[in-house]
Amino acid sequence: MDALPITETTGAEYASNNEGRMHACGHDGHMAMLLGFAQILDEYKNEDPPRLFRRRRFDPLTNALLIFQPAEETTGGARYICEEGVLEKYNVKRIFGFHLWPYIDKSVIATRSGPMMAKSSEINVEIEGRTSHCTAYEEGIDALHIGCQFINKVYNMPEVLPEAPSILKFGKMESGDVRNAISSHTRIEGTLRCLDIETFDLIIAKMNEIADIYNDAYSCSIYVTHTKGYPPVTNNYRLFSKASSIFSDLGFRELEKPSMIADDFAFYQQEVPGLFMYLGTGSGIPLHSADFNFDESILLTGIEAYRRLLKI
């Protein structure tokens, strides 16, 4: 599930057999934890009453929904699960999720209340000018030059970047066909990350204002578009508070600040209260790298954490 287009170099006996495809983000570990938890639930179901649930006396098979969700790495599978009404169908009242995290000590559970991960969106800027020979540059409208100006202007708008952290970076720019002609078209591609929707909307609005100013100044046409992307991951305070208590002996850690990466778990949190957590691998090997791996013993911590979460 969610294999990435990377050739694995771990040398593990369970390494991918498919060239150019590997589990490099821990999603295989996420599945293994849920499968292990499912086995525990299955073992409990015939106990009378189930010892895990003696205090509340409910059948775990009607009160625990395990979601094996694909496509986090692509289109955001959580979005489609929500749109198809899965949470409503099973009367989900709260939701929890883990992600293996190499930058935290082995088996440590880490999370925080409030903003935890960023909203992400792809930004596209199209600039239409007019071509001319470089010796008659005054007859053209230089889309390449305007594109460079646009990037510089956007990068230098501190009034748009308030105290709430945000990242706006352009990583790709295409323009022109030949070296001695004024470019008539430029395309710029980038990414925007914000921890709240208000900051995101503000930055998009300011980019459109800059586009309008340049349209008037250069007689060009600039179009700024963006994808819907993933919402920000924002953890419920009550669930965080309870989790921090029940995980105290498992090596719990409260994160000091949010991360600017994104995860589609945020779609679930738009429907019901949720808590997203990291489970440390302690390896320091980055996600999405060819040598990403983890000690499988940490999965036992994840399974135990899920067991305890059913008591919340």
Please place each PLM-identified region on the residue numbering.
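A generic secondary-structure signal
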Residues: 40, 84-85, 213-214
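DPxDG-like acidic metal-binding loop motif
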Residues: 31-38
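Alpha-helix C-terminal capping segments
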Residues: 38-45, 269-271
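Residues at alpha-helix caps and immediate loop-helix transition turns in enzyme cores, especially N-
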Residues: 10, 33, 77-78, 139, ...
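Metal-dependent amide/peptide-bond hydrolase catalytic core
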Residues: 144-312
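Histidine/acidic-residue-rich, glycine-tolerant segments that coordinate divalent metal ions
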Residues: 3-6, 12-22, 28-29, 44, ...
